[in-house]
Amino acid sequence: MNNPLDTTLVDSAIRFAVDAHSGTERRGKGFPYIIHPLEAMEIVATITNDPEMLAAAVLHDTVEDTDVTTEDIRKTFGERVARLVVSDTSDSTLGWRERRRGVMDRLARSAWEDKVVAIGDKLSNLRAVYRDYKQGGESFWSRFHAPNGKEDYEWYYRELGWALIDLSETEAYREYMDLLEKTFGKEISAPHQIDIREYEESGAGYNAVSYNYRYGKTMVKMYREGVDRAVPEQELRQSRNVRSLGLNTPLAGRLVWDGKRYGAEFVRVEGKRSFARAISQNPEDLTLYAERFAYLCKELHNTPCSQNDFESEVDFYHRIINQNTDYSASEKQRLHEFVNQVPVEYTCIHGDLHIGNILTANGKDFWIDLGDFRWGNHWFDLGMLYFVCKCWAEEPVFELFHISKVQMAQVWDVFARIYFSTDAPGTLSEIERKVRPFAALKLLHLKTLGLHYPEGDGMIRKELLGEL
């Protein structure tokens, strides 16, 4: 039999908070102020049943907004409750931004329990903001004291989201981030300045380097110098859109800048490694990961994709062909014709499909590097995978995927059998014949980006232009 929960401390804290806030009204709401602390406590209760944390949640505004002192809380409820209450209290003598900046800086470095108490308060506030904004529209923001109205509140609530990042696995945090998007939209604000010395490199690709933050649960993908901020902005926006489709991907955060490079910030996936890294560390598991990748790709390619949030792969390749300067007008026309004859599909494609762009951790898999995510025919995606598995040279394969070209070819062989549900040699050979022009098309894309490969032009001319 379970022992009954001792609610003595929480009951006492509720009565204390009711008395402290007696006669006060939640500003502009028309109901007693105590409703807010009670809601904050209810939110905290979705994360923990620790009585002292629940007590601190319902008491969080007593020191800041009433005559109650920290010493009163300490004498009545103990040292830990008093400390938790003070951790969620701001300095009323400071200006609007300075006061809130102090709260966020403190929260970012606080213990987990401080953040749990804080999210009860902040989520309750954001719920109220969202409800009132829906009713009042843009005129709602004029009711507040922030010098710059909505701009200040957007800054504040977005920054709070990252100060509370340690709670990213909780339902309360997910609700907070969802309301943040509904209230302020998906737009990326000014880049957040980071000190790259506070980060540890965790991986590198052909145009970006990934880092883990040493003092928190974030990771950043920093693009090479000279890459416009629009590229990481696109990746952040695409990542949010992909997540809304129900596909698993790390939670997207802020646009960042280290003084030389722009980057995209994400919630770090603890214990992560890519399928490529997993194979390099445990070569005996190659078949397991290649099969798993095939099933994940089948799921991806069967997911209906929003034509409003993502670009068509056909439109994308028409643009790439037009941008290329290495081919004549008649050759470009033949390339356009190839793209046009591909049957139309309205499902998701990754755009940069390979075993380095899927992470695994604690039994979960996460799609990453989603800047090229689009909708269209799955053969476009398979062309990229075939190229890196079967066509690329040994050196770039090992540099990016940490396995040999022979192993990479084995990945395709296993993948194709599972993805197409066949072991028939003739059918598999026909699949390779069909996918090679799409691999050549991906080479055309890479060539347009300034990434030249010895096998590139010859493959494009053979597979797409019919030259021997």
Predicted regions, residues:
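An alpha-helical support segment within catalytic cores of ATP-dependent transferases
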Residues: I188-H192, N302-G351, I355, A361
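Short beta-strand micro-motifs within the conserved protein kinase catalytic domain, predominantly
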Residues: L251-Y262
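Active-site activation/catalytic loop segments of kinase-like enzymes and analogous catalytic loops
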Residues: L382-D423, F438-E455
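Conserved kinase catalytic-core helix
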Residues: K272-E311, K332, F338, V342
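Active-site acidic catalytic loop and adjacent metal/ATP-binding pocket
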Residues: A208-Y215, H336-F380
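Short pocket-lining segment of the protein kinase catalytic domain that shapes the ATP-binding cleft
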Residues: A264-K272
